[in-house]
């Protein structure tokens, strides 16, 4: 699998076949941030307060919207307004994992109506290609007005100890991404997947974005099996965007923590591309 990770985001944005990837890179360049904050809080007030305070320093906010005890229209209206105010994208970490007919309803309907507000979603590919096809068809339907601003990350690897997202599963993730490049933005993985074999030929302009979870300045794990990487180690292994949660939102000063992740993440990115960012 090819990698364009040595190129600056500005170059990748200008050549990228996926419109949401272009926007993502442009946001990152404008803000000099490749940080995704995982806002795993449980009330709308906490979520919106965190988004407003950290918004200037992040490229993406990642939500688990179903853990909010008071989810409602004010949640989404507030989050959309803050995304516009601070120029960040919204990533709903739903991890879709069901048959195609079910995930279409989960994505586009129900109480959460995720397709209406989340720029980025993710899925596991245990159900095989049909899950990617179903989500792509939903987002790219002719009567859906936000299709060019919606994209999918395939959960190709996980950072938890003993994860089974390896081997053939990871190879299948690459296969399906290559079949739906206009909708699949990239991967959630622990590294660039350049060495992963695939049965599908890569397009000449292939450029999948890599998000790496479990990034923490302390580089320690937790008692539930989470294994952390530092911003430098994650980006050195091929991450384009680093996902940090507790290292930011449980810090004594979350704003100062977000600034530290922004600085370290961006410096690591600049080192990787030889300081060629604009």
UniProtKB/Swiss-Prot annotation:
CC terms in the record's Gene Ontology section: cytosol
One Gene Ontology biological process = 'de novo' UMP biosynthetic process
* Lyase recorded as keyword: yes
PROSITE patterns recorded? OMPDECASE
Q: Which reaction does it catalyse?
A: orotidine 5'-phosphate + H(+) = UMP + CO2
State the EC number(s).
4.1.1.23
GO MF entries: orotidine-5'-phosphate decarboxylase activity
Whether Lyase counts among this entry's keywords is: yes
Give the matching Pfam families: OMPdecase
Which residues does the annotation say bind substrate? 40, 62-64, 93-102, 228, 246
> EC top class, in one word?
lyase
The source's domain of life comes to Eukaryota
Q: Which family does it belong to?
A: Belongs to the OMP decarboxylase family.
Q: Which NCBIfam families match?
A: pyrF (TIGR01740)
Q: What is this protein called?
A: Orotidine 5'-phosphate decarboxylase
Species name for this entry? Passalora fulva (Tomato leaf mold)
Encoding gene per record: PYR1
């Amino acid at each position: 699998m090819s990698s364009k990770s040595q190129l600056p985001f500005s170059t990748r944005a200008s050549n990228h076949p996926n419109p949401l990837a272009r926007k993502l890179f442009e946001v990152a360049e404008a803000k000099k941030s490749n940080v995704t904050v995982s806002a795993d809080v449980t009330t709308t007030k906490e979520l919106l307060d965190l988004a407003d305070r950290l918004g200037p320093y992040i490229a993406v906010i990642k939500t688990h919207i179903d853990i909010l005890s008071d989810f409602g229209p004010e949640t989404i209206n507030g989050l959309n307004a803050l995304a516009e105010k601070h120029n960040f994208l919204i990533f709903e970490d739903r991890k879709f994992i069901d048959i195609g007919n079910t995930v279409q309803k989960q994505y586009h309907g129900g109480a959460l109506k995720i397709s209406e507000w989340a720029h980025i979603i993710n899925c596991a590919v245990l159900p095989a290609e049909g899950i990617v096809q179903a989500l792509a068809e939903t987002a790219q339907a002719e009567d859906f007005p936000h299709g060019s601003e919606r994209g999918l990350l395939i959960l190709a690897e996980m950072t938890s100890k003993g994860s089974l997202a390896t081997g053939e599963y990871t190879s299948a993730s690459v296969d399906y991404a290559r079949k739906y490049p206009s909708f699949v933005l990239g991967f959630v993985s622990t590294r660039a997947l350049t060495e992963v074999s695939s049965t599908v030929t890569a397009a000449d302009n292939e450029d999948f974005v890599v998000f790496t979870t479990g990034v923490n300045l302390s580089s320690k794990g937790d008692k539930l099996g989470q294994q952390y990487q530092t911003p430098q180690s994650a980006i050195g292994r091929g991450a384009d965007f680093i996902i940090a949660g507790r290292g930011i939102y449980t810090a004594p000063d979350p704003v100062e923590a977000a600034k530290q992740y922004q600085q370290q993440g961006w410096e690591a990115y600049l080192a990787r591309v030889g300081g060629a960012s604009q």
